[in-house]
């Protein structure tokens, strides 16, 4: 999804202070031309400023002839999500403006990075067949991480929304921009509202994608939000059937442990799957296949759990849980009641970690801004739902709100959203934004659109598993050519049917992948069954040719065709 753009025009707009004046260094990820990366040195705690930390950032200078003086500054959500990798993507959205991507303090590209592999391993251990003993549980693991960070001199009290917002204000001052346009998504929408309130003279406009207002009881609401998202997708009943079935009889699924680099057999209950789905639905491509996926899981197609479990493991391994929990334990968890235990282990796990860490409760900011604000929400978003985002947006004095038929982080999935954001930033005072279709969710897959099977995902991990298909396609092509040259019609038609089958399957898979690559984790195109008759016809014609004339090419082709059909029907279909 990340689009890299390199522009070659000379910079002609008046210069501002460059990032080289704020501790430049090499960029940790690939960047477009004219991008500088660096660190902003700030106090770890502004109320006790002795210890310093470094906040990572990148600045991509626009090369447009009509370059505007006010850049766009972007921060990802999380907490603890990285931002720099989106620099090129954002530069394409705003070609006439500099783009600044700023990391959160304590995240991967800041120093120190508050990684907690102990916590990630304990959370992954939730899926192991044998429950962890208290000494190996989540709270104990989080405490080991906390103690290790303390030994490094890190004070977790300095990692909260208030300090992160102050870092953004300090970066504008350091880079020398008179004004800039704030762009936040998910958690960082809260940060950007705080920045706008703290630095009104430096803010020209604000974009809030998937708005998470401070007033929301996020943990208390999440089970309801997930149920509402399933209802809007039309699979609330199959979802509950799936959860109940797997809670009664948990599935056993082979999963790769990304931290240890080896497979283990996970025990996945319905609540575990609900937790993983709640995270996965933040991706618009997953949302599009969710109706087919949930319905298949409700019917017992547990082999589809492998890609979900692998994705969950990869997500755990890539997250800085020290920062995540430091923020949540100060700014989010204390403002929820937890009167009802959640079905989601991440919700309960965050409460468990915060009970163990005992960080101080933050003071509510109740920030607002008079700057023009554009708020975007996704209809199927279970994380920052319209139910809470839209009223909060309307409470901002100069805000407008748009709903899109997609999920979380609207701008990543919707070209229309990107157009509207760019139009708003170009003229925040305009009362009318160029219209475009907000129905931007990748086309949802109906039951008839997919032949449910886990085989494509298995092949994506081990391409050699597709060898029978490749062998059949090559053998069919050879059979067609040689039989046609020798005037053997039956064998030639058998080869032609095989080539047609292989070509149609390849074309339909490629078309589906271009439409939504994630769909291949759920199955093959629905036309697969129809095309299979061509493979059967190829085998029948080849067998007839063999019966008519027993030659070794016919024998080989018949063996390959028969073996392929056994593989196709018993494993792939």
Task: Give each language-model segment a name.
Residues 18-263, 267, 326-328, 332-393, ...:
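Gly/Pro-rich cap/lid or specificity-loop segments adjacent to the active site
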Residues 154-157, 263-264, 276-280, 313-316:
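Second-shell loop/turn segments in exported
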Residues 267-295:
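P-loop NTPase catalytic cores that bind/hydrolyze ATP
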Residues 283-284, 293-304, 311, 315, ...:
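Short loop/turn hinge sites at secondary-structure boundaries
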Residues 303-332:
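Long, low-complexity segments enriched in small/aliphatic residues
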Residues 1-18, 40, 168:
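Secretory targeting and sorting signals
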Residues 212-230, 293-295, 301-313:
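Flexible "cap/lid" loop of the alpha/beta hydrolase fold
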Residues 299-302, 395-401:
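Structural alpha-beta junctions
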